[in-house]
UniProtKB/Swiss-Prot annotation:
HAMAP family: LepA (MF_00071)
Classification via NCBIfam families: lepA, small_GTP
Entry keywords, A to Z: Cell membrane, GTP-binding, Hydrolase, Membrane, Nucleotide-binding, Protein biosynthesis
Descriptive protein name: Elongation factor 4
GO MF entry, a single one: translation elongation factor activity
Subcellular localization(s) per the UniProt record: Cell membrane
Gene: lepA
Family matches, as CDD domains: EF4_II, EF4_III, LepA, lepA_C
Catalytic activity: GTP + H2O = GDP + phosphate + H(+)
Amino acid sequence: MSERMQYIRNFCIIAHIDHGKSTLADRLIEKTGFLSERETDKQILDNLELERERGITIKLKPVRMIYKAKDGNEYELNLIDTPGHVDFTYEVSRSIAACEGALLVVDATQGIEAQTLANVYMALEHDLEIVPVINKIDLPSANPEHVKKEIEDVIGIDAEDALLTSAKEGIGIEEVLEAIVNRIPPPKGDENKPLKALIFDSFYDNYKGAISFVRVVDGIVKPGMRIKMFSTGKVFEVTEVGMFRPNLYPVEELKAGEVGYIAASIKNVKDTRVGDTITDADNPADFPLPGYKEVVPMVFCGIYPADGQDYENLKEALEKLQLNDASLVFEPDTSAALGFGFRCGFLGLLHMEIVQERLEREYNLNLVTTAPSVIYKVYKTNGEVLDLDNPTKMPPPTQIDHIEEPIVEATIMVPTEYVGAVMELCQDRRGAYLGMEYLEQTRVLLKYEMPLNEIIYDFFDALKSRTRGYASFDYELKGYKESNLVKLDILINGELVDALSMIVHKDKAYEKARKIVEKLKENIPRHLFEIPIQAAIGSKIIARETVKALRKNVLAKCYGGDVTRKKKLLEKQKEGKKRMRQVGSVEIPQEAFMSILKLDDEK
C-alpha cells in the first residue's frame, strides 16, 4: 500500500430522516475550513429545493475535505452522502461500497429507526468500520446512555466510545474528525494495476455531458485516456477528472483510493450506470467490481397533461428529468378518457411523488395521474408469461391461468402501545405475519410479508396516522407469489373508462368497487340525463350507483285534469331523456380521477 493512501479516508453518514445528517456534514466541512461561517446556514449537500423542503437527501453530493489531525499529518477525507429513503436502497448500497467506514448518526432523543437499521446492515455486509455518533445532545430530552444501549442491543456493535455531538451547536465535531482518522481504515488498492473505478452516482452537465462520480479502486485515470464501461462495453475518452470541493474542481489525475468525478463527453446518463465499473479500454481489468445490478422500476403510473396542448412540454420535462435520473423510465401512452400522456416507472412511491412534484414545480405543468400499479406476472393458458405494468393491457379472464404479484418483506419499528393498530393494518393489507422482537421495553420490531400492491398506495400514510407518526418502515423485495387477482373495470354511462381500471385482490374487489362508485357519484356533476356508474369484473357488474338527471317539471302547466294527460307528458320526457342518454357524452372532471387515488384516506 502506498504512502499516499494512508492519508485518505472515505466515509459515509448513515442516519434516519431528521437525525441531523446534513447539519453534521455542514459542520465537518466548516471545521476543515472549506466554507466560511456565512455559507453554513444552507445545507451544503442538499441541492434540490425539494430536498431541503422535505428534509431528505435525494441526489448525492460527495465532498473532499483536508483535515490537519492532532498527529500533525494532513488527511484527505472524502464524505460520500447517502440518500436515506427506502426507494433508493440500491443507490445507498453503491455509496456504501465506495467507502471504508461509516458514521452512524442517531438522534439522542429518538434512538434507532427502521431505515437506519437497513442501511447499517448493508454497511456491515460491506465490512465497513462503523463509528456511532449520538447527535442532538444539547436537547433537554436527550438520553445518550439509553441510545448507546439501544445501538448495542439492536445492531450489536460496541457503542462504549460512541461520540456525543450536537451538530447544531458545533459540540464534539473535532472528536468526530479525529475518530474518522483513527478508527476508519485507509483504502486498499493498487495504482499500478489496470484501472477499476466504481460509479456511485452521476449527473448531467449541459456542457460536459454526463459526469460520473467514482471511487477509484485500482489504477489511475487521467484526461486523454480511453475508458470502457463494463455493463455496456461502450468506450469514451476522458476529457476531465477532478475532486469535489463541494463544487467540481479539475485535477490532473485520480489515483487508487481517491474519490472524484470523470467527464468523458458522455451524451446520456444511461451510459454511466450506478454500480457499474469503469476500466481502461486499452488495458482492461479482467472482471468488474461486484454488486452491479440494473435498476428496475417497481411502481408504474400514467401521467397525463390536464391540458392536452401541454403534451410536448410534458415530454420535454420528462426527458430533462431523465438526464439526471436514469432510474426514471417512461413511454408514450394514450387513454380514451385522458388523451395522450406517458406511462412512467419509478423506484418507489417517494420517487414517484418527487418526480410529479418536480414536473409541476419546475416545469409549471398541470398533471392528472392514474392510480399507481406494480408489475404483475400473468401466466396465460397457452403457456405465455406477460409482465403487466398497466391494468388496461390485461388479457380477458378466459385466457389467464394464474397471476403472480410482487411480495415484499416489511420491517416496521413501532412503540409498544401501537402494536395492535399496526398489526391490524398489516392484516388488512393482506400481510402475512413473520415475527416480532422487542428492542427494549418500549419498542417493537415487526416483520410482515406483504404484497407490494398494498403498500404503494398509501400504506405509509395509514401507518403514520395510526401511530401518530412514531412508526418507521422499510421494505425489501422478496419475489413473486401466486395470488387471486382480478381486474376491476369502471363503466360510466355504459362506457369503459380505461384510466380507472385497476387490479385488485378478489376478496377486496367488492368493497373497493363500492367505494369507487360512491366516490364517483359525488364527483361527477348531474347531466340532463341519468348516468349509471358501474364497477365490473369481466362482464359481471358488482356495484352500481346512478347520478340522477336534472329535469324540468313538465307537470307544472297541468292544473287538475286527467291522469292520462300527465302520464303522456312524463312518458314523453322519459323518451327524450332516453334518447339523450344514447347520444350524450359524460364530462368527467379531473377531481373525479384524483378522488379515487385518495380513497382510503377517509378511514
